[in-house]
Amino acid sequence: MSTSVKQTEARAIAKYIRMSPFKVRRVLKQIRGRSYKEALMILEFMPYAACKPVLQLLQSAAANAQNNYGLQKDQMIVNYAYADPGPVLKRFRPRAQGRGFKIKKPTCHITVSLKEVL
C-alpha cells in the first residue's frame, strides 16, 4: 500500500555569501509571508545590496518548486526565510608605527522556502 503525498514546499540555500547576516535579515523580514510575485516586486525596488543574492535565491526556489514538484509560481508564498552566520574571514590592515588592525569580513548562509497555497 503506497500513498503518495504531494510535496507543497520547495527551498533553496545560498552558502558563503560575502555579506553580513544582519544586513541580509533586514531584507528577508520584508518578504517573509508575502506571495512570490509580491516578494519579487519588493526585492527589485529596495535600495539594499543584499537584495540581489536574495532575489536570485527566491527565483531559484521558485524554479525548484516548478521543476522538481510541479508547483505553480502564482500560487506560492514565502514560507520562511532566514540568514545564518557563516565563517568570518579575518584580515589585517597595516597601521602606523608597526601596528595592524583586524578587519572582519562576515559571510552568511541564506535559506528561502516557498510553499504552495491551495
Curated annotation (Swiss-Prot):
Could you tell me which CDD domains the record lists for this protein?
Ribosomal_L22
Subcellular location, record wording = Plastid, Chloroplast
Pfam families registered for this protein in UniProt? Ribosomal_L22
InterPro entries named in the record: Ribosomal_uL22, Ribosomal_uL22_bac/chlpt-type, Ribosomal_uL22_bac/org-type, Ribosomal_uL22_CS, Ribosomal_uL22_sf
**One GO CC annotation, please?**
chloroplast
One Gene Ontology molecular-function label: structural constituent of ribosome
Q: Where on the tree of life does the source sit, at the highest rank?
A: Eukaryota
- Give the GO terms filed under biological process for this record: translation
Print the keywords alphabetically.
Answer: Chloroplast, Plastid, Ribonucleoprotein, Ribosomal protein, RNA-binding, rRNA-binding
Q: Subunit arrangement? A: Part of the 50S ribosomal subunit.
Annotated function: This protein binds specifically to 23S rRNA.
Q: Which HAMAP family match?
A: Ribosomal_uL22_B
Q: Which NCBIfam families does this chain map to?
A: rplV_bact
Family, similarity comment: Belongs to the universal ribosomal protein uL22 family.
| Protein name, UniProt field | Large ribosomal subunit protein uL22c
